[in-house]
Amino acid sequence: MSLDNCKKVAAYKAVDDFVKDGCKIGIGSGSTIKYAVDRIKELGLKNVICVPTSFQSTQLIVEAGLELSDLSRTPELDITIDGADEVDKDFNLIKGGGGCQLQEKIVAYSSKKLVIVADHTKESTELGENWKKGIPIEVVPMAYVPVMKKLESSSFSLTPKLRMAVNKAGPVVTDNGNFIIDAQFSKPLSNIPQLAIDIKMIPGVVETGLFVNMTKIAYFGQTDGTCKVKSI
């Protein structure tokens, strides 16, 4: 089974388990979320309200004909369904490979439950075991050089790179008008909760792609067509 089909298996199973009539749902971003939106549409549920985490998920919601809202009108959500770049044994996450971690974190924090859906390659024992692109860090444009220098210092010993755009000249610009630094690490991360706090405290850092203590359940689609559900 292809990775796309693994993603579909996970997304369909999570939607079937958690999304009911009248649900207020945060819709994450990334390649797996398309399948979650497809399944919500297929089920034909009534009075389902969807809050997006990015321009991409806004488009998915609109194209599916689902009811679109935002946190101003719907500030409390029942559930957010989102993907992840990596999930470790303690349910620490790295997110932000698609550059949407700030809005994803805001929407997830506004939800009673965050459910992660992914293919089997996103499950690991420690962060960095499978995901090799580093921690995505959203920064104010004027601060990206000082932030990178701080991340390189002995306080962090990370290797930061400004994420560059593919189809335009210059850096990637987020939906919020900020830049993204990918902070790579050469060995498994330790004390992830403290690391997330320390990076966030650097002036100019808007948000990090480290999600700590935000979810207790993840769905991983397997190559044999089954779905592995992990929870704590």
Swiss-Prot record:
Pathway: Carbohydrate degradation; pentose phosphate pathway; D-ribose 5-phosphate from D-ribulose 5-phosphate (non-oxidative stage): step 1/1. Belongs to the ribose 5-phosphate isomerase family. The lineage of its organism: Eukaryota, Amoebozoa, Evosea, Eumycetozoa, Dictyostelia. GO terms for cellular component: cytoplasm. This is Ribose-5-phosphate isomerase. CDD domains: RPI_A (cd01398). One of its GO terms (molecular function) is ribose-5-phosphate isomerase activity. Its EC number is 5.3.1.6. It comes from Dictyostelium discoideum (Social amoeba).
